[in-house]
Design a protein with these regions (language model features):
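ATP-dependent phospho-/nucleotidyl transfer catalytic cores
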Residues: 1-8, 19, 134-137
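Catalytic-loop signature of eukaryotic-like protein kinases
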Residues: 10-16
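Conserved protein kinase catalytic core
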Residues: 16, 33-35, 52
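Activation of the activation-loop gatekeeper triad in protein kinase-fold domains
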Residues: 27-31
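Active-site activation/catalytic loop segments of kinase-like enzymes and analogous catalytic loops
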Residues: 37-90, 116-133
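Long, amphipathic alpha-helical stalk/connector segments used for oligomerization, subunit docking
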Residues: 94-96
Length: 178
């Protein structure tokens, strides 16, 4: 894990505003220089809260499918865009070598999935909970939802370096939900 960019810390869906003109991120006072996988992981991790909430509170199958697709596409398009930007911006010959490029980009995505797992667990068991969890007041719904999220967090942490992608992480969460 290296210091690769200025990251937001605590980045989540509530701090991102997007429209046709661009994207804005609020609360920059939390920013620091660190691994880009941290912010990417926070975004990925936070997307699972909406899906878990709908899965345990009777959300429609259509909504759950849309959330699953959003997560899968976010993971995969992030990896694709990172690779495209790398190819566009990196010019130093050693860093352009295919083995180095692959190791670096795989490392960023491994960090991202690992941080997604820690973000999920932190938001379930820590002091900074999310509304998708706290709004579920029925213990018969909330406890299994929290367990599913923790299980996913553990999976992401343990398997972060195993070449995960959007299909793998959404398939795993479907298995956990079953």
């Amino acid at each position: 894990v290296g210091s690769e960019m200025c990251i937001r810390d605590s980045l989540h869906s509530g701090s991102i505003f997007a429209n046709e003109q661009g994207i804005k991120v609020i609360d920059p006072e939390f920013a620091f220089y660190g691994p880009m996988g941290y912010d990417i992981g926070n975004v990925i991790g936070n997307l699972f809260f909406a899906w878990a909430n709908k899965a345990y509170t009777g959300g429609s199958a259509e909504t759950q499918t849309a959330l699953e697709q959003t997560i899968r596409e976010t993971c995969d398009k992030t990896a694709e865009k990172l690779a495209a930007e790398y190819d566009k911006l990196v010019t130093f010959p050693l860093y352009c070598a295919s083995a180095f490029r692959k190791a670096y980009l795989d490392g960023v995505m491994a960090d991202s999935y690992g941080y997604a797992g820690t973000e999920i667990i932190r938001r379930v068991v820590g002091d900074s909970k999310v509304i998708e969890v706290t709004s579920v007041t029925d213990p018969a719904q909330r406890l299994p939802m929290e367990r599913a999220l923790i299980d996913l967090g553990i999976y992401l942490i343990k398997n972060r370096a195993g070449g995960l992608n959007g299909a793998a992480v959404t398939e795993e969460f479907r298995k956990i939900l079953a």
